[in-house]
């Protein structure tokens, strides 16, 4: 990590209720609040609700209430829904993961993410601990919530479970998001998707890449090219 230019250190003692071999610690980090972030951005935007796009062309979005025309169009719909171009239905697969909110328990100091695939994540918010984990291909694991509840009872036996959520993420074939032109035949239609478990990070990278493409016609972050080699 340090060779990539990020300040980090290896620590052996961590504030967790289970044993670890150690952890990579990143200093001077902040805890991100996505709703406050979105609310601040939305102040300068016009957001049209209850207007699902029924059909899409390169320059038009057609809805039940009318059409919207634009010189540049970005499809940022979690899953790219235009199938006749791009063929994203064969370039993406779905994964599901789970989160529980716990109260009446000690909240670890910091934000933690287990390195192994499907491992646990922990972060606090006020008097609540958010415990996430149990990742699997969608449709392959019928009792993901129950398995996460078992982990909660094991590591936080006194905690009260006050809420639960499931997330479904679009995964790419190589782990990097698809950002750029929707297809080779659509110079003014763009896409951002396949963020995996890193939606906020992927969204910020997409904003940088697509703003450059729309304004300057060039892409400065080549690894995210959609027509890249993935095997």
What are these regions (language model features)?
Residues 3-4, 21-72, 76:
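Helical element adjacent to the flavin cofactor pocket in flavoenzyme catalytic cores
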């Amino acid at each position: 990590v340090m060779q990539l230019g990020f300040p980090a250190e290896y620590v052996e003692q961590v504030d967790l209720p289970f044993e670890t071999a150690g952890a990579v610690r990143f200093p001077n980090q902040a805890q991100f609040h996505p709703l406050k972030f979105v609310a601040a951005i939305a102040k300068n935007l016009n957001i049209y609700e209850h207007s699902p796009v029924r059909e899409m062309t390169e320059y038009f979005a057609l809805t039940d209430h009318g059409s919207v025309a634009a010189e540049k169009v970005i499809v940022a719909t979690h899953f790219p829904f235009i199938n006749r171009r791009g063929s994203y239905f064969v370039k993406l697969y779905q994964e599901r993961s789970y989160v529980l909110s716990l109260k009446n328990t000690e909240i670890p100091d910091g934000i933690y993410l287990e390195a192994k695939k499907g491992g646990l994540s922990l972060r606090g918010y006020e008097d609540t601990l958010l415990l996430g984990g149990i990742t699997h291909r969608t449709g392959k694991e019928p009792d993901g919530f129950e398995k996460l509840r078992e982990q909660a009872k094991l590591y936080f036996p006194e905690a009260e479970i006050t809420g639960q959520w499931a997330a479904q993420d679009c995964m790419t074939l190589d782990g990097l998001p698809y950002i750029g032109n929707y297809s080779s035949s659509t110079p003014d239609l763009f896409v951002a998707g396949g963020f995996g478990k890193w939606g906020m990070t992927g969204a910020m990278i997409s904003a940088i890449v697509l703003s450059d493409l729309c304004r300057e016609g060039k892409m400065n972050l080549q690894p995210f090219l959609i027509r890249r080699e993935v095997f």
